[in-house]
UniProtKB/Swiss-Prot annotation:
Binds 1 [4Fe-4S] cluster. Binds 1 molybdenum-bis(molybdopterin guanine dinucleotide) (Mo-bis-MGD) cofactor per subunit. Heterotrimer of alpha, beta and gamma subunits. Predicted to be exported by the Tat system. The position of the signal peptide cleavage has been experimentally proven. The lineage of its organism: Bacteria, Pseudomonadati, Pseudomonadota, Alphaproteobacteria, Rhodobacterales. This is Dimethylsulfide dehydrogenase subunit alpha.
Length: 910
C-alpha cells in the first residue's frame, strides 16, 4: 500500500513550489499575506486546494485567434494575469445562422488551446539579433532596433545601387494569413518591387483543376453548407485530423441522412467515421474519378439540362484538326474567343453566349437547344461536340479496367457512381494535398466532370476546394498600395523549382523512360516546357536574387531536397538575408539578421477564413514579449530607416518599368503620410473601410470577439445572412458566365501543350511514385494533426500526444520483412540522401508504402537531417501554360504547384 510520510509530503511540496517558479508561475504564491486578526477574516489559503483555485484567476480577458496557415480561424478568450497569458478558452459564441442548420461552435483545436505555452517557449525570438559567425553557426549578437534597421536599410539600398530593382526577394509565407500581418509585408514589397512568390503554389496548395474547369479555384462552400448534403465524398482529405473545428458539420450531415465516403490509401481518422472506406492505391485518384465518369455516361445518369446550359460539353469541335470551332474559322476578322453550339431546333450552328469574346454575358439559352451528341458540318468544316470527345475518353476507363490500378472493385465503383448521380446535393471534397501530386490536376478536373454531368452545382453541391476568397477590397488595396505599384509576383512552384536547382536532383532520382510512361513526359521534355513557359512570358520568373527578406516562411524546412536547396539559396542571397519571425525556426537559424515579430496574442489584427462568415478580432491581450513588434510596426521602422538613409545618401528612387521605387518617400507612402503607424491604426482603418464589416465598429468587434460579415463579403454573390455560402450560385441561378474562355465549366482545352500531352479533355494519368524510379516504396507526407506545418511541432504538449519525435508509419507486414520493430529507429534512404526516424506500426497502410506526417523541424531529427532530403520533385507542365483564355498566370489562381508525393525510398533498421 502506498504510504505518505511527513517527509515525503514536504519534499513534494518543495518540488511543486520550485516547479511553479520555474514555469514562470511564481505569482501563484505571491498572494500569501501575513495572518492578522484570524477572527475578523478568513485565511488567504484555507487549504492546499486554494493554490489550484487561485491558479485559475485572472486580471482581464482579451480576444484573439491564431493567424498562421490554418483554416480553422477560431475565436478564443485570452486570460491574462500579471501581464502573462495563463490560458486560453474557445469563445464559442458564434450565432446560429438558421434554426435548420447547426451552429459553428465551439471552434478550436488542441494547437490553439496550448498557444499560451508555445509563446513562452525557448525558441521564441525576443530581440533583434545579428549574425556574428558563419551562416548557420548559431553565433548571434543582440542589437537594437535602430542598429538593425539602419544596417538592413543600407544593405537594401546597396543592392539597388549595384544591381537595380528586381534582385530583392521580400517573400511573405503562409505563416501570415491575418489581415494586418499580411498587409504589412505585401505593402512593403509593393513599394520596393520585391519578389513575392505565390503562397499557394510554393507549398503545393492550389487546386489547379478547379481553376481549369470553373475559372476560379477560390470559390467554394462554407462548412455549414455541408450539413444539407445527402452525399459527401472525401478524396485526399482527412477532415477529422486537419479540419477539427469544422468536422462536426460532416458528421451532423451523416446523422441527418447523408452518405459519407472516404477515399484514402489508409484507414485514417475520417475513414473510421464514414459509411464507406474506399482503400485506393496511393496516387490513383484520377483513375477512380474517370471510372465513375464512365459509369455515369454509359448509364446515361447525366443531367442534360445542366450540361447544355452550364458546361462547354455541347460546344463544337472541329473533326479535321481537333480544335474548337471559332468565329475566326468562319468569318474574316472573327474572334478566336467566340464559339458555337449546334441548335437541334433549327439544325444550324449558333454562337455561344457568355464567352470571353461574346457581347452577350449570359448563360441563358433562350430558344436554342444545343446538341450534346452528333456530327455536323459548319461552313464546310466537319464538327462534333465536346461531349463526344469526353465520352470517347471516358470509355477507356470502365471500372473493370481500372480496378487493378485503384485497388477498388468494379462493383463498388458502379454502385457508388449510381448513388452519387442520384444525390440531390452532392459534395466532392478535396484537401490541399491534391495540389501536391503531379496528377492532382487530372483528379480535380475529372471530379468537376462528375459533378457537371450529374447537375451538381450551386445549391445542389459541387467541388469543395477548402477556400473562398471573400470580397475584401480594402485589405487588397492596403496590401498592394492601391494597385499603383505591385511586387514582382512570381509563380510559386516554378520559382522554388528553378531557383532551388531541383531539376538536378530529379535527374538523380527518376528513370527518364519510366517517368515518361507514368506521367506522359520525361525530364528533358519537362525542362523544355519550363523554358518555354518562362521565355513566352506565360509564367513570371525573376532569376537569381541578391537579397532575401523572409517573413513568416520556413522555406528551409518546407522545400524539397532540403539541404541542397538551402545551400543554393544561401549562395544566391549573398548580400542580405533577413528573417522576420516569431520563433527560431529552421530558416531563421541561417539568417544574417533576425527581427522578432509579435505573436498571436501580442498585436491587433483581424482574421477571416473560407469555412465561415466570421472575422475574428485580435485585441492585443498582452504586449509583445521582449522587444518583439507587430509586423506593421517592423515595416514602419524599416521604411523610416530606408527613407532616412536614402535622403542622407542623396537617393530619390529607382525607375522600374512604368513605376518609380521612391525610397525618399517610402515611409510616407507606407504609413499613408503618418496615418497608419501601428497595428491598431491598421485594424481600425480596415474595419472603417472594409465593406465586409457592414458598418460595424471596431469597439463592437472587440466586445464580441468577432464580426459577422455582411452581404457584401460574398466574392461572386451576396453572402446571405441566414444561408450557407454555396459555390457558383451566380452561375447556376443568376446565369452569369463562369470566368472561363467559353464562359462555361470547361472540359475541352486545345492549348498546344494540352494537345501535346493528350489532355484536351479530362483523363487519367499516374503520378511518378516508385514506378518512375529505382526504389521500392512509395513515400507520401500528409498534413499532421499535431501542428500547422512546422508551427507547434516542437511544443511539449503536442509531442506528448504522439511519439514525441519524428516517426514514419509502416505496415506490420513490411516491418516484418525488413526486420523492424515497432518503436525502433529506422534509416529511410534513396540516392538523394537519408534520414532517421522512429517506426510506428500502422496496419491499414499498404506494404509498398511508408507515410510520414509533414512539418517536423530538421533539428528534431538525428543529425538535423529532415525527411525532405529524400524528396525529389517535379512540376506539372499543364499548370505552366498561358495565353489561353483563363489559363494565364494569376496569383492564387493559376500557376504550377510544388509537388511533394512523387518520390520513392527504401527503409532498413538503423
Amino acid at each position: 500500500m502506498l504510504r505518505t510520510t511527513r517527509r515525503t509530503l514536504m519534499q513534494g511540496a518543495s518540488l511543486v513550489g520550485a516547479g511553479l517558479f520555474a514555469a514562470g508561475r511564481g505569482w501563484a504564491l505571491n498572494r500569501l499575506e501575513p495572518i492578522g486578526d484570524t477572527l475578523a477574516e478568513e485565511y488567504p489559503y484555507r487549504d492546499w486546494e486554494d493554490l489550484y483555485r487561485n491558479e485559475f484567476t485572472w486580471d482581464y480577458v482579451g480576444k484573439a485567434a491564431h493567424c498562421i496557415n490554418c483554416l480553422g480561424n477560431c475565436a478564443f478568450d485570452i486570460y491574462v494575469k500579471d501581464g502573462i497569458v495563463i490560458r486560453e478558452e474557445q469563445l464559442a459564441k458564434y450565432p446560429q445562422i438558421s434554426p435548420d442548420i447547426p451552429d459553428a461552435n465551439p471552434r478550436g483545436c488542441q494547437k490553439g488551446a496550448i498557444h499560451s505555452t508555445s509563446m513562452y517557449e525557448a525558441d521564441r525570438l525576443r530581440y533583434p539579433m545579428k549574425r556574428v559567425g558563419a551562416r548557420g553557426e548559431g553565433k548571434w549578437q543582440r542589437i537594437s532596433w535602430d542598429q538593425a534597421t539602419e544596417e538592413i536599410a543600407d544593405k537594401i539600398i546597396d543592392i539597388y545601387e549595384k544591381y537595380g530593382p528586381g534582385k530583392l526577394m521580400t517573400h511573405t509565407g503562409s505563416g501570415n494569413m491575418s489581415m494586418m500581418r499580411m498587409a504589412a509585408p505585401y505593402r512593403f514589397a509593393s513599394l520596393v518591387g520585391g519578389v513575392q512568390l505565390d503562397i499557394f503554389t510554393d507549398v503545393g496548395d492550389l487546386n489547379t483543376g478547379a481553376h481549369l474547369a470553373y475559372g476560379n479555384a477560390l470559390e467554394s462552400f462554407t462548412s455549414d453548407a455541408w450539413f444539407g448534403a445527402d452525399y459527401i465524398m472525401f478524396l485526399l482529405f482527412n477532415p477529422v485530423a486537419t479540419r477539427i473545428p469544422d468536422a462536426h458539420f460532416l458528421w451532423e450531415a451523416k446523422w441527418n441522412g447523408a452518405r459519407v465516403v472516404s477515399v484514402a490509401p489508409d484507414y485514417n481518422p475520417s475513414s473510421i467515421h464514414s459509411d464507406l472506406w474506399m482503400p485506393i492505391k496511393q496516387g490513383a485518384d484520377p483513375f477512380l474519378a474517370m471510372s465513375m465518369v464512365n459509369v455515369i455516361i454509359e448509364g446515361k445518369l447525366y443531367n442534360e439540362a445542366f450540361m447544355k446550359e452550364q458546361t462547354d460539353l455541347p460546344i463544337l469541335v472541329r473533326s479535321d484538326n481537333g480544335m474548337l470551332l471559332r468565329e475566326a474559322d468562319l468569318e474574316e476578322g472573327g474572334s478566336d474567343q467566340v464559339f458555337y453550339h449546334w441548335d437541334s431546333r433549327t439544325g444550324a450552328a449558333v454562337k455561344v453566349k457568355g464567352s470571353m469574346g461574346s457581347e452577350e454575358k449570359t448563360l441563358v439559352l433562350g430558344d436554342v437547344d444545343p446538341a450534346l451528341e452528333g456530327s455536323f458540318e459548319v461552313g464546310g468544316i466537319p464538327v462534333t461536340t465536346v461531349f463526344e470527345k469526353v465520352r470517347a475518353e471516358a470509355a477507356k476507363y470502365p471500372p473493370e479496367e481500372t480496378a487493378a490500378i485503384t485497388g477498388i472493385g468494379p462493383g463498388v465503383v458502379r454502385a457508388e457512381a449510381e448513388t452519387f448521380a442520384r444525390a440531390k446535393k452532392a459534395l466532392l471534397m478535396t484537401g490541399f494535398n491534391i495540389g501536391r501530386y503531379s496528377n492532382g490536376i487530372y483528379t480535380s478536373w475529372a471530379l468537376t466532370l462528375m459533378l457537371a454531368l450529374t447537375g451538381h452545382g450551386g445549391r445542389t453541391g459541387g467541388l469543395d476546394t477548402s477556400w473562398i476568397a471573400w470580397n475584401q477590397p480594402a485589405l487588397l488595396e492596403l496590401a498592394f498600395f492601391d494597385f499603383k505599384k505591385l511586387p514582382r509576383l512570381e509563380a510559386g512552384g516554378l520559382g522554388e523549382f528553378v531557383r532551388g536547382g531541383m531539376m538536378e536532383h530529379s535527374r538523380q532520382h527518376y528513370d527518364n523512360d519510366k517517368l515518361k510512361a507514368r506521367t506522359g513526359f520525361d525530364l528533358d521534355e519537362l525542362q523544355e516546357m519550363i523554358d518555354e513557359s518562362i521565355d513566352a512570358g506565360w509564367m513570371p520568373y525573376y532569376g537569381d536574387m541578391k537579397g532575401l527578406i523572409s517573413i513568416a516562411d520556413n522555406k528551409f524546412r518546407r522545400n524539397k531536397n532540403a539541404e541542397a536547396y538551402r545551400e543554393r539559396i544561401l549562395e544566391e542571397v549573398e548580400e542580405l538575408f533577413v528573417d522576420i519571425n516569431v520563433r527560431m525556426d529552421s530558416t531563421a537559424q541561417w539568417a544574417d539578421y533576425l527581427l522578432p515579430a509579435a505573436a498571436h496574442y501580442e498585436a491587433w489584427d483581424l482574421r477571416s477564413i473560407a469555412f465561415h462568415r466570421f472575422v475574428n478580432v485580435f485585441s492585443r491581450p498582452v504586449p509583445p514579449i521582449g522587444e518583439a513588434k507587430s509586423d506593421w510596426e517592423i515595416m514602419e521602422i524599416l521604411t523610416r530607416k530606408i527613407q532616412e538613409r536614402a535622403i542622407a545618401r542623396g537617393i530619390t528612387g529607382y525607375e522600374d518599368g512604368d513605376v518609380t521605387r521612391d525610397f525618399a518617400t517610402i515611409h510616407d507612402d507606407y504609413t499613408m503620410d503618418g496615418t497608419l503607424m501601428t497595428d491598431h491604426d491598421v485594424v481600425s482603418w480596415l474595419v472603417e473601410n472594409g465593406p465586409e464589416f457592414a458598418g460595424a465598429t471596431l469597439e463592437e468587434g472587440v466586445e464580441r470577439g468577432f464580426f459577422v460579415m455582411g452581404e457584401d463579403a460574398g466574392p461572386t454573390q451576396k453572402l446571405r445572412p441566414s444561408e450557407p455560402y454555396h459555390a457558383f450560385l451566380q452561375q447556376t441561378e443568376g446565369k452569369e458566365p463562369y470566368k472561363t474562355m467559353t464562359g462555361r465549366i470547361t472540359f475541352f482545352v486545345d492549348h498546344p501543350r494540352f494537345v501535346r500531352l493528350g489532355a484536351t479533355v479530362p483523363t487519367a494519368r499516374h503520378h511518378a511514385g516508385r514506378d518512375a524510379s529505382n526504389y521500392p516504396l512509395n513515400f507520401f507526407s500528409p498534413h499532421t494533426r499535431w501542428g500547422i506545418h512546422s508551427n507547434w511541432r516542437s511544443n511539449k504538449f503536442m509531442l506528448r500526444l504522439q511519439r514525441g519525435e519524428p516517426n514514419i508509419y509502416i505496415s506490420p507486414q513490411l516491418a516484418a520483412a525488413k526486420g523492424i520493430a515497432d518503436g525502433a529507429q529506422v534509416r529511410v534512404f534513396n540516392e538523394l540522401s537519408f534520414f532517421f526516424a522512429q517506426a510506428k506500426f500502422y496496419p491499414s497502410l499498404p506494404p509498398d508504402t511508408i507515410m510520414m506526417e509533414h512539418g517536423w523541424e530538421p533539428h528534431q531529427f538525428p543529425n538535423w537531417r529532415p525527411m525532405n532530403v529524400c524528396m525529389a520533385t517535379l512540376l506539372q507542365p499543364l499548370e505552366l501554360v498561358g495565353g489561353w483564355g483563363h489559363l494565364n498566370f494569376s496569383l492564387w489562381h493559376w500557376n504550377a504547384n510544388q509537388l511533394a508525393h512523387e518520390s520513392s525510398v527504401d527503409i532498413e533498421p538503423a
